A protein has these predicted regions:
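Active-site recognition of the HExxH zinc-binding catalytic motif
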Residues: 56-72, 87
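Single conserved hydrophobic/aromatic residue that forms the stacking wall/gate
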Residues: 1-12
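An active-site-proximal "capping" alpha-helix that borders the catalytic cofactor pocket
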Residues: 82-97
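Long, well-structured alpha-helical subdomains associated
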Residues: 95-158
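Non-Sec secretion/translocation targeting segments of pathogen effectors
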Residues: 160, 164-170, 174, 178-184
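Short pre-active-site segment immediately N-terminal to the catalytic Zn-binding motif
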Residues: 43-58, 77-78
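Catalytic zinc-binding patch centered on the HExxH motif and its immediate surroundings
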Residues: 13-40
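Hydrophobic (often cysteine-bearing) scaffold residues that line and stabilize catalytic clefts
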Residues: 55, 59, 83-86, 126, ...
Length: 184
């Protein structure tokens, strides 16, 4: 039951992130966990990711989609490094807010970008952006999660049609029985 409720929690978090994201999200087989394409204005996530890894990657890419839409940074340059710092640090804070521990991955990921080459002034500007973005995402995600909190699982269209057909069938059967009683 705990795993099932955790799974439902993950589903609600994914749905909330989809609502918070202002760009389309596509799940496709990838060699990487995910990426945001400013040209397509779309987030692509590896279809093989699940649970906390999927949510963490979604947060990271949603952050890119909110902060770096007009980016002309080139892989490996200082601007790209700063953008990765913003996205990963924001993802860490937001994920941590929802009891998803990404510290092992996050610390290694950030170190791989050579953050020791960033000046204190650059770091200060990035940190302000990270805090503001994380706070905004958490507020929006919380609103979306609150909407889902009291919702009953929705029935599919087919389930609704079957239920209506059964009801109609009962009514017809009842009318038929009443008609048969009157005739006898």
């Amino acid at each position: 039951d705990v795993e099932r409720s955790r799974g439902l929690g993950d589903v609600y978090k994914r749905q909330a992130l989809s609502e918070v994201s202002e760009v389309k999200i596509g799940l496709i087989p990838l060699e990487v966990d995910g990426f945001y394409s400013p040209q397509d204005n779309c987030i692509f996530i590896n279809a093989n990711l699940h649970g906390a890894d999927l949510i963490h990657t979604l947060i990271h890419e949603v952050t890119h989609s909110k902060l770096h839409t007009k980016s002309e940074a080139i892989f490996g340059d200082k601007q790209y490094t700063l953008q990765e710092l913003e996205a990963e640090s924001t993802a860490y804070i937001v994920a941590n807010n929802y009891d998803i521990d990404t510290s092992k991955y996050t610390m290694g990921y950030l170190n791989s970008w050579g953050l020791d080459k960033i000046s204190n002034e650059e770091l200060q500007g990035v940190m302000e952006n990270i805090q503001k973005t994380a706070r905004g995402l958490i507020e929006k995600i919380d609103l979306e999660l609150e909407k889902r909190k009291n919702l009953e699982p929705t029935k599919s269209k087919l389930q609704t049609e079957i239920q209506e057909a059964k009801k109609e069938q009962k009514e017809l059967l009842k009318k038929h029985e009443e008609k048969t009683k009157k005739e006898t």
